[in-house]
Structure formats: structure tokens, C-alpha cells
Curated annotation (Swiss-Prot):
Primary gene name: thyA
Keyword Methyltransferase annotated: yes
Provenance organism: Cereibacter sphaeroides (strain ATCC 17029 / ATH 2.4.9)
Positions of the catalytic residues: 179
Enzyme class: transferase
Pfam families reported in the protein's UniProt record: Thymidylat_synt
CDD domains, A to Z: TS_Pyrimidine_HMase
Family: Belongs to the thymidylate synthase family. Bacterial-type ThyA subfamily.
Key words, A-Z: Cytoplasm, Methyltransferase, Nucleotide biosynthesis, Transferase
Record protein name field: Thymidylate synthase
GO molecular function, one term: thymidylate synthase activity
């Protein structure tokens, strides 16, 4: 049987070989394929933390936990040493202030100055806001995550068990419109929780590996809260692309052989979806190839 990571390596290779060369929003340019699907079996505890390069899984899980708080400001992320969202507010600050501040100096100001963080660390109504506090036309806020878990507990055969972040009325206010847009869930007759994640836009080298980990961690948490066990994680990509400054790195990664996937487990039964912490996650048997450095396109 082929290693499950081979699906991802094959997608990298296909994008390198057949990707449509496009000029994109960032100005970097991409090789793009439209429509991709990967399927990962989480039932034995294995999770899609890539082994052909080191993936900083704790960073991905911390980001997912931040989403679940409903957060929209980078300050709590920086307090957890997570810097993956800094580029967008930094670019906005440089553009609006004219100050050529370094990323390190900008992040330090966010950490030390609450007023500065409130003004310049804000990302707008991004993922967490939509997941936990979607604003309806009547002014009421809707908690999609709480509603999902309640439905999983009370009506697990429902075909309406999903949440998403593409709020048309607020997309223009977001620092970055949602890439991993829709999460849908399905319960089998033997109590397995399957998940499907749809991404409209996929940075295949840098973004997708984090999205795999975040979605798997979320599936473990939701399964525990609903009294289920994890099943399949199905990942679907829309515009699936490699940035032109990532091609050498992608070629390097496709030349590496996958190693055994690690296992992820929760160390305790949390009282609710809001009670999980990074310390609740254990990853065992992770032995990856070295990290592959690449620049984020903003």
C-alpha cells in the first residue's frame, strides 16, 4: 500500500509538471491546478503531519486553538510565539505609516503596547469571528462551532453539519479572505467522525501542510466532544498552486521518501470545545526530514 503522504507528493509533482502559469494577486506568480482531493485515515491515530519536511505542528495547533477563541488580533498568537499571521498587519502598517519597520520590531510593539496592538494587530472579521460570532442581519451572533457539536450529539445523520467563514458582507474587511473556507462533518453508523475541508486557495508548499494538521487536530477535538472517534479527513483544494519562488523547494521535497506518520492524541477529556490547550496534544513518533525554508507571499 502506498504511503498516505505520497498523495501530497504526487500533487506537488503534478503542479510542477502541469500547473498553469498565472500572474496572481501577490505579484509573485504561480503554477496552478484547479481541483484536487486527498484522503487521510485518522482512525488508527495517525495524522497527516508531513515527514518529507519538518512541519511545526504545535504552531498549526496553536493557530487552530486561536481560531476557536474567536480571535481576530495577532497579539495572542505572538504571546504563544506564533508568527504566521504577522505579514498582513505588518504590510498594512508599513503602507499606511510609511515606516520601514522590521517584522521583529513590529511584533515587539504589538506585544508591549496594547493600544498599538488594538490598532495594528487587528485582522478584521477573519476565521474565528465567523466561526464563533457570525453576525446575522438581526444583530444576533451565531456560534457555528457550538451548533455543529450540538447537532453531532443529537442528530448525527444530519447532512447540515458544517461551518464556514465566507461571509460575503464582511470579506472586504478581512486582512486575508478565508482560504480554508468550509468544514463539513459526517458520522458513520459505527460512530466514526469523518471530515471534509474545502480550500478555495491553496499555497501548496507552505499553507497546505499546516491546514492538514489544523483540520486533524480540530477533528480530534470535535470527535471527543461528540463522543465519537476520528475517521477519514478528506481535503479538497480549489485553486491549488505553487508560487514561482517555491519551485526549487517543491522539487527538493518530491525527491524525499516519506517516513512513518506520527500519531496524535488528546491527553485529557476537555469539558468543552473552549477548554483545550496546546498541552492537551501529544504527538508521538515524529521523525521528519529537515525543514525546507520558503518565503510567504503576501
Amino acid at each position: 500500500m502506498a504511503h498516505p503522504e505520497q498523495q501530497y507528493l504526487d500533487l506537488l509533482a503534478q503542479t510542477l509538471e502541469r500547473g498553469d502559469r498565472r500572474v496572481d494577486r501577490t505579484g509573485v506568480g504561480t503554477l496552478s491546478l484547479f481541483g484536487a482531493m486527498l484522503r487521510f485515515d485518522l482512525s488508527d491515530g495517525q495524522v497527516p503531519i508531513l515527514t518529507t519536511k519538518r512541519v511545526y505542528w504545535k504552531t498549526a495547533v496553536k493557530e487552530m486553538l486561536w481560531f476557536l477563541t474567536g480571535g481576530t488580533n495577532i497579539r495572542p498568537l505572538l504571546q504563544e510565539n506564533v508568527r504566521i499571521w504577522s505579514d498582513w498587519p505588518l504590510a498594512a502598517y508599513r503602507r499606511e505609516s510609511g515606516e520601514e519597520i522590521s517584522q521583529a520590531a513590529f511584533e515587539q510593539r504589538i506585544l508591549e503596547d496594547e493600544a498599538f496592538a488594538a490598532r495594528w494587530g487587528e485582522l478584521g472579521p477573519v476565521y474565528g469571528r465567523q466561526w464563533r460570532r457570525w453576525l446575522g442581519p438581526d444583530g444576533r451572533e451565531h456560534d457555528q462551532i457550538a451548533a455543529l457539536i450540538e447537532t453531532l450529539r443529537t442528530n448525527p445523520s444530519s447532512r447540515r453539519m458544517l461551518f464556514h467563514a465566507w461571509n460575503v458582507a464582511e470579506v472586504g474587511q478581512m486582512a486575508l479572505p478565508p482560504c480554508h473556507m468550509v468544514y463539513q462533518y459526517h458520522v458513520t453508523s459505527d460512530g466514526r467522525l469523518n471530515a471534509l475541508l474545502y480550500q478555495r486557495s491553496v499555497d501548496l508548499l507552505l499553507g497546505a501542510p499546516f491546514n492538514f494538521v489544523g483540520a486533524a487536530a480540530l477533528q480530534l477535538m470535535i470527535a471527543q466532544q461528540a463522543g465519537l472517534v476520528p475517521g477519514d479527513l478528506v481535503w479538497v483544494g480549489g485553486d491549488t498552486h505553487l508560487y514561482l519562488n517555491h519551485l526549487d523547494q517543491a522539487r527538493e521535497q518530491t525527491g524525499r521518501a516519506p517516513r512513518d506518520w506520527p500519531r496524535m492524541r488528546l491527553l485529557r477529556q476537555a469539558d468543552g470545545i473552549d477548554d483545550y490547550r496546546i498541552e492537551d496534544f501529544a504527538v508521538e513518533g515524529y521523525d521528519p526530514h529537515p525543514a525546507i525554508a520558503a518565503e510567504v507571499a503576501v
